[in-house]
């Protein structure tokens, strides 16, 4: 691919992830987006449930439970753009993978349940988006159900998530009375039709809120709806592209993913406004997305995507240049040149060989244990991309073996699972315990399942009095030595060899931070 055509292709890429609370409709909206992109023919192919079309559940545990534990990648064309959608676990439980996936995208679609408003999972994910000022576009879902007053939901987005919200369209009615949406910028009503959820729906438009056709649709409510829309125009933020791109304002669309309504308008806005692949910070310089030379970083490793092959796949975000099949690239951390001839791309589980990938694309590399999260690959330059963090776990368990003779297998399994990012493992300085940390409860189940399935180790969990963890660091060696001596009971080494403070309570953490002001307590750590 010539440098010019790479630059043109890069400008047309849109790489994003969807964030939402469980049950807000993320799986449904993913399915509708793929329908518009002609990536799947039948509405219903991405179900996170045990439907016959299930496309995005790989691990056998996922298939048993009917949830998507791991994030997959889907690419589809839309309006002369190439859209890369990174799916993130939407189950009641999620993991660090969800957080890290957000470091590999250029923008985010936030799906909010119109009946429930902003929920705690969304708040956590927004905090991660804040680390990089990621642009956020919002879709308020389930307008065909009885929902809260849209003004209240908008207000909640602004106050709870601390971001300005600019409605692009406004719902006309809700629940059984839902008639459609009115675009505040084009003066067009898009009319809602029932029963078109599993295909690309008809787009019936009425031009002009004050037209006779609008009167016929709105009936007795016409005057009230016009008043409400006037009020909304006066009381809400106007859409500002620069503020959106800076992560300070979110354009808001209303619709129903299940009814496949409002999704098209949102997707139109998304491909128009969302940024193409952005430049990325590395340790020595900023890498431009349109540079000729290839570079990329690994943000996620997934095991056993194919039970027949017991392999692990490293997901890599291409940051510059072009990957071509059979090319040589430098694995910077190991200082080794490797030939990559079998990278894969996915439509959730359907693997296909990649001939070529450019900035913004996600490719999968076969990994036999040498690739770790955060690894950078280049065409020879020694640089390392930054901003791919470990997040401090929020839940902890002590892990114990049923068969004490299998300590070696347990340590090997935990080491590999922690390199992969499935869990974090801590070895306290004062005893021989092994403590496992996670962001969500399901991660513990996944670890126990995989230890048994892949390493033939049966392990059980016990409660442990750890409330949170912080990576610790101090420039003054003397003060660090004193801290280590006095706090040894609470110190551990993590899977990467880093000193970690395991706080029994939040209060204990605050007191320790006050007592040792020269020691840095970090809640994230670079890979």
Swiss-Prot record:
InterPro entries the UniProt entry points to: EF-G-like_DII, EFG_III/V, G_TR_CS, P-loop_NTPase, PrfC, RF3_C, RF3_dom_3_sf, RF3_GTP-bd
One example of a Gene Ontology biological process annotation: regulation of translational termination
Entry's localization field: Cytoplasm
A GO term for molecular function: translation release factor activity, codon specific
GO cellular component, one term: cytosol
Predominant location: cytoplasm
Binding-site residues for GTP, renumbered to this chain: 20-27, 87-91, 141-144
Highest taxon of source: Bacteria
Keywords: Cytoplasm, GTP-binding, Nucleotide-binding, Protein biosynthesis
Domain tr-type G: residue ranges: 11-278
Biological role stated in the UniProt entry: Increases the formation of ribosomal termination complexes and stimulates activities of RF-1 and RF-2. It binds guanine nucleotides and has strong preference for UGA stop codons. It may interact directly with the ribosome. The stimulation of RF-1 and RF-2 is significantly reduced by GTP and GDP, but not by GMP.
Family (UniProt): Belongs to the TRAFAC class translation factor GTPase superfamily. Classic translation factor GTPase family. PrfC subfamily.
Protein's UniProt name: Peptide chain release factor 3
Species in which this protein is naturally found: Saccharophagus degradans (strain 2-40 / ATCC 43961 / DSM 17024)
Lineage: Bacteria, Pseudomonadati, Pseudomonadota, Gammaproteobacteria, Cellvibrionales
